[in-house]
Amino acid sequence: GAAGGGFLAAWLVPRWGWQSVFVFGGVVPMVLSLVMAALMPESLTYLVHRQGSQARIRRIVERCAPGSTSEDTVFVLPAQSRVESHERPVQIVLNRHYRAGSFMLWSIYFLHLFLVYLLGSWLPTMLKDAGMDLQQAAIVSAMFQLGGPLGSILLGWLMDRHEAHHVLAGAYLLGGAALVLLGYVGGHYALMCAVAFVIGAGLNGGGTGMNALSSHFFPLPARATGNGWMHGLGRIGAVISAFAGAWMLNAGWSLAAVTAALAVPAVLIAALLAMKYLHYRGEGRTAK
């Protein structure tokens, strides 16, 4: 979707003007929200937690696993041993057990959005300043976006089979190494496309994996709050990235200097993932 939006905009603007991009971008999500409200089933764990209709829960389960329930089937959730019954979602996110993990997740997502938004916003300009023509810069930038879907699928597959923190830390280290390499392969157009694809797979794919990691970490009563705070505080990194990218370019930084500097947040993310893993090691799926 991220990569396809650029191609769609290139088709819309010459025909109906720049306003058409905003009309399309506003109308389609509203239509999709109505479709989702009508057809998308509620989370099973949320329905059970809220003591929803058992008949409704059984219908959803039957869609996933036909024949697995009967009229006598009742669904319950195990007690959350680290959640007090009187605690509100915000209190759970910040209680003694979850506080350290919450701060680490927020820091990781701050750095993640700083990275991907700076690259998404400024990479075409940086490549053009490095001597590439506009068309080549656009294609290399598109390869960065196209790496995300493949990276997300591959990392999801790996996270199901290996320790999630290790997989994600490896993805960010790979993305950081590819960032450094990008600054030194100028003039090799095909190689730059391949390296940009790897960067997108590691960084954009890692962001998708972070959503899964966060959802596994927070208990059900605070899952939406924990994820929401992670995304909200992460957006601060996205905002700062716009100013940081402009400052780097105005200061005359070379492509190699910018990409080497951006590898630092990728390494910090890997370090924070390792710290979170070590802090919660031995707690099973809650640690994920």
Language model features by range: what are they?
Residues W18-S81, L268-K288:
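Central mid-sequence intracellular linker of multi-pass
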Residues L94-I153:
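Extracytoplasmic gate region of multi-pass secondary transporters
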